[in-house]
Amino acid sequence: MYGGAGVGGGINGAGIARDAAGRGLSVLLCEKDDLAEGTSSHSGKLVHGGLRYLEYYEFRLVREALIEREVLMNAAPHIIWPMRFVLPHSPEDRPAWLVRLGLFLYDHLGGRKKLPGTRTLNLRRDPEGAPIKDQYTKGFEYSDCWVDDARLVVLNAVDAAERGCEVLTRSPCVSARRVN
């Protein structure tokens, strides 16, 4: 009998199992294949704060994601690395000041400590602009992170097991019953 059961050994299943086991629950995590074999192994491998959600005024969501990104960077620096991205500006899409404002918020909503801040680029003079098409003259460079997603899943599952979770791989869940 378990206090909680997780079906699926991806990042969500392993992370929830780790959290539940860490709170003292008796937990079972079962995965039909191997850990991180499904959706988690096909991710974009970014630990990002959800920059695009600022456009929909999802400030709290972005703040929470940025805070968690910082937590992950501190907890697992051996598998999470900073990455810089160049975003060419196209005046037809939105004004440069609006993009810069969004990136300013992205830099500051989560209390960023480790990553460098956004900077405005002259794409014709800045080396970062070299691979960008000539039609773009202005851009922005901002930070996010890259993660070894499979290792993150496995580390969560191992920690869950160390906290008492029973982790079963190659074990499909064929039925479950909830008992009150």
Can you say where each PLM-predicted feature lies in the sequence?
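Beta1/beta-strand and adjacent pyrophosphate-binding region of the FAD-binding site
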Residues: M1-N12, L28
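Flavin (FAD/FMN) cofactor-binding and adjacent substrate-gating region
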Residues: H89-L168, S175-V179
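Gly/Ala-rich phosphate-binding loop of Rossmann-like dinucleotide-binding domains
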Residues: A17, A21-G22, D159-A161
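Dinucleotide-binding Rossmann-like beta1-alpha1 core, especially the glycine-rich loop
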Residues: K45-P127
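Extreme N-terminal leader/targeting segments of oxidoreductases
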Residues: M1-G4, D19-R23
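Glycine-rich FAD pyrophosphate-binding loop
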Residues: A21-H42
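Glycine-centered short loops/turns at secondary-structure junctions
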Residues: G8, R23-S26, G164
